[in-house]
């Protein structure tokens, strides 16, 4: 079974919790990097949940700034990545490895 580097999420945030990615059947994912980019002139808050459990909870990202987090979080078949922010001018970038 090959390990494949993969972009899981490249999406603008919603202001209520929304599913950004679901692990495909017969796959396991390791999330290795999360970036939250605020493109507004004011600070925002953002949250990321792995399988409905808060991983990043209401973190503040400054105006026109990016939060970058390295991690090694395993997600199994059908588990989800969800996210939301206080503004829709926030972008989530989440990548890792799929096998």
State where each predicted segment sits:
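Beta-sandwich interaction modules
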Residues: 64-78
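Short solvent-exposed strand-capping/beta-turn motif centered on an Asx-Ser/Thr pair
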Residues: 36-41, 86
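Solvent-exposed, conformationally flexible loop/turn segments
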Residues: 13-18, 61-67
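Short, surface-exposed beta-strand/strand-loop-strand elements in extracellular ectodomains
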Residues: 39-59
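C-terminal interaction-tip segments
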Residues: 1-33, 85-99
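Short, aromatic- and glycine-rich surface loops/edge beta-strands on solvent-exposed regions
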Residues: 79-85
């Amino acid at each position: 079974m090959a390990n494949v580097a993969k972009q899981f999420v490249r999406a603008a945030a919603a202001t209520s919790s929304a599913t950004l990615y679901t692990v495909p059947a017969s796959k396991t994912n390791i999330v290795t990097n999360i970036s939250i980019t605020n493109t507004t002139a004011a600070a925002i808050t953002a949250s990321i949940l792995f399988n409905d459990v808060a991983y990043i909870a209401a973190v503040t990202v400054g105006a026109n700034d990016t939060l970058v987090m390295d991690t090694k979080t395993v997600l199994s078949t059908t588990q989800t990545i969800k996210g939301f922010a206080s503004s829709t001018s926030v972008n989530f970038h989440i990548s890792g490895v799929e096998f």
